[in-house]
């Protein structure tokens, strides 16, 4: 039986804009009110996804959410026609309108936490959508995320879908952006690392002072229970509160793992040595590589600005590992120098491939934000909705779809344009036919 780690990238939605919605995310705040290009953003994402498929990796796409989200605007008291609702919201509550127009679902690292069948007691692949309660614009995503995941992984013989956790800050859950999995082989039982920012039920425990800790220990423990994980294959690690306060809002901004490699910054975690020992003990006797980047070589500020750790570490068909990095890493002298040195060291990482995802980067999301990792065996891959898997035909079809429906430029003030609702719904309705998703959106029901 062959085993793979698939990447399911978020297709950037038609309302991709820079509204500066994400407190704690430095890039998002710094680029607030800039002009975006939904068309460029979608094409950059597709190009990156296709390149990984061409490298021989299993690559899928996850559909975007319906935006503007008129259903939520109606829930909070706006009424009338679609045009009237947008007009009223723009005048009376512009911040709420912006929140209901975000294309943030493109960052599918926050879509869900995924545990492969090799790790779970029932031998199924488990999905729990993240509730994303810390940010209003993301907290309205989980129900549709669940619909899209179920339409993509739609065979109950192999896939188990859970409801997102209770919508309360005690269970603040940001999905796979705070989760990674180490294993000797993708098909072997691994060690799942859950990284949290604070303990909700322990006020005296360490936590950041400036920016919010979006993930709680309680949420991570709940997901592990839902996924039927063994305690011997689970490690809970607290992220260093000081780096959260420097803009490291998710763990995938300061660390990333793949198979037997954990690539992380020296300041990423609390109690680092004790936790590395726990990982090693639970991992077993197989080779395990801890690749620690010292502050003396890459400062936290450079790591955040370049998104050195918001890279994908992937295993190529040759068995070597490669880092999929944003071009911003080439533009930062300290980071570029480090990556050039890294590929010469005694680790499985032997090459770095650079991609332009600047439209996403300017909103605070690098290559790793754009993908949800799903480790699968060949039977599970065959059970996935095949219309969501990247190949030459889907790449061509989705690029044509973007050309047909997406705007070249979008300003925040354009979000109140009633035509944008029509354009977005028309595009998504066609997309559900291309990807054979069924009626996953509110407007289709």
From Swiss-Prot:
GO terms for molecular function: N-succinylarginine dihydrolase activity. Gene3D superfamilies: Succinylarginine dihydrolase (3.75.10.20). Pathway: Amino-acid degradation; L-arginine degradation via AST pathway; L-glutamate and succinate from L-arginine: step 2/5. It catalyses: N(2)-succinyl-L-arginine + 2 H2O + 2 H(+) = N(2)-succinyl-L-ornithine + 2 NH4(+) + CO2. GO terms for biological process: arginine catabolic process to glutamate; arginine catabolic process to succinate. It holds the Pfam family AstB. It is an enzyme of class 3 (hydrolase). InterPro entries: AstB_sf, SuccinylArg_d-Hdrlase_AstB. Its EC number is 3.5.3.23. Keywords: Arginine metabolism, Hydrolase. Catalyzes the hydrolysis of N(2)-succinylarginine into N(2)-succinylornithine, ammonia and CO(2). PANTHER family: N-SUCCINYLARGININE DIHYDROLASE (PTHR30420:SF2). Homodimer. This is N-succinylarginine dihydrolase. It comes from Shewanella pealeana (strain ATCC 700345 / ANG-SQ1).
